[in-house]
Amino acid sequence: MKTIIVFLSLLVLATKFGDAKEGVNQKQKKEVTQNEFREEYLNEMAAMSLVQQLEAIERALFENEAGRNSRQKRCLGENVPCGDNIPCCGKLACEKTAGYGWWYKSPYCVKPTSG
């Protein structure tokens, strides 16, 4: 109990006499914050303009890439039904075959016959 009273009395004394130079401290704080905010604000504005420029460049690059269809579209493998809407893979051809085709009445993706 005695230690609590000692600490509370020290706390009261520290808060009472802690800010003896309040006017000087406030002026210094104001000057420091004004200078810091001025420099930081200018630096932040420069960084924001740089970010906006980079975003514009990135947007332009991605627009060009999206227009080129750089990725191959999905396609079907061998011995799979195909049609106008469902393409076969690059080296396969969509043909009516004597195997599955007669039963399902649809063309299938097969290796192209030479001849």
Curated annotation (Swiss-Prot):
The keyword Manganese does not apply. Disulfide bonds join 75-89, 82-94, 88-109. Residues 1-20 form the signal peptide. One of its GO terms (molecular function) is sodium channel inhibitor activity. Expressed by the venom gland. The keyword Calcium does not apply. GO terms for cellular component: extracellular region. The presence of a 'disulfide through disulfide knot' structurally defines this protein as a knottin. This is U17-barytoxin-Tl1b. It comes from Trittame loki.
